[in-house]
UniProtKB/Swiss-Prot annotation:
Name of the coding gene: Cpped1
Species this chain originates from: Mus musculus (Mouse)
Catalytic activity: O-phospho-L-seryl-[protein] + H2O = L-seryl-[protein] + phosphate; O-phospho-L-threonyl-[protein] + H2O = L-threonyl-[protein] + phosphate
UniProt KW keywords: Cytoplasm, Hydrolase, Metal-binding, Phosphoprotein
Record-given protein name: Serine/threonine-protein phosphatase CPPED1
Single Gene Ontology MF annotation: metal ion binding
Binding residues for a divalent metal cation 2: D90, N127, H246
Function: Protein phosphatase that dephosphorylates AKT family kinase specifically at 'Ser-473', blocking cell cycle progression and promoting cell apoptosis. May play an inhibitory role in glucose uptake by adipocytes.
Top-rank taxon, per record: Eukaryota
InterPro entries from the UniProt entry: Calcineurin-like_PHP_ApaH, Metallo-depent_PP-like, MPP_CSTP1, STPP_CPPED1
Residue span of region Catalytic: 47-250
Amino acid sequence: MSAMEAADVFHRARGRTLDAFSSEKEREWKGPFYFVQGADTQFGLMKAWSTGNCDAGGDEWGQEIRLTEQAVEAINKLNPKPKFFVLCGDLVHAMPGTPWRQEQTRDLQRVLKAVDQDIPLVMVSGNHDLGNAPTAETVEEFCQTWGDDYFSFWVGGVLFLVLNSQFLYDASRCPALKQAQDHWLDQQLNIAEQKQCQHAIVFQHIPLFLQSIDEDDDYFNLTKTVRKELAEKLTRAGIRAVFSGHYHRNAGGTYQNLDMVVSSAIGCQLGKDTHGLRVVAITAEKIVHRYYSLDELSQGGVEEDLKELLKE
């Protein structure tokens, strides 16, 4: 499937928003709802990891196709339907300009085409989607294929912000693009700070931190300077939660009133977690989330206690 054909399938973010949701109609709180978060489908990593060649490996991705198909089937069976399905980056393993990237992308788009048309997809960029040090060209390629790399949208009175976390990791090759996101983010946080929304939530690929705001710098988190500056901005604006991936394990912690949620992968696991998805229920007062293995969600769906929250 070409990028143009994919455009007919996905409500891709354009103009820094997602047209699947009307910002005018969705700005008011209408009661509890839920969404599903996934991360790191990363077609190709399981083969690359198994052979110890993560840089040049990844010439097979049949396992990831089957796992993502299982995730889509599980989501489609959910009742009531989630408001949306967000994929928090590393959609494919092949970096920009490397072998198998087009094939991996085409296969992922084909699998995602099966998501129920009433469940919009929200696509977040990861380091494998843009390169560890993105350029204007790699960002443009992502935008053409999947939609804007950062944007905001409203659902039921909740403001959702999607960030390009590679700009926070290494923007040395595209400083002007980072500045543009920074300026845009300040504008969005101003809306949240004025309490014009019931809650405000951020999606990005790389976590601010894995367990603690004061932890050491690591491949899997943002540097202390960057994370502390961003965490202060987010908490000052009243952001309630940041949902991310990248770690291929479940993790997370809190900073002041901010919940940092790190979800394991649909694809390759690097720890002891199972291939899975996170269900996130939003009520007037709280945000409750739970990670399910693909088998659990396929067979049992959302548990009754979470469903009860949706009736409040």
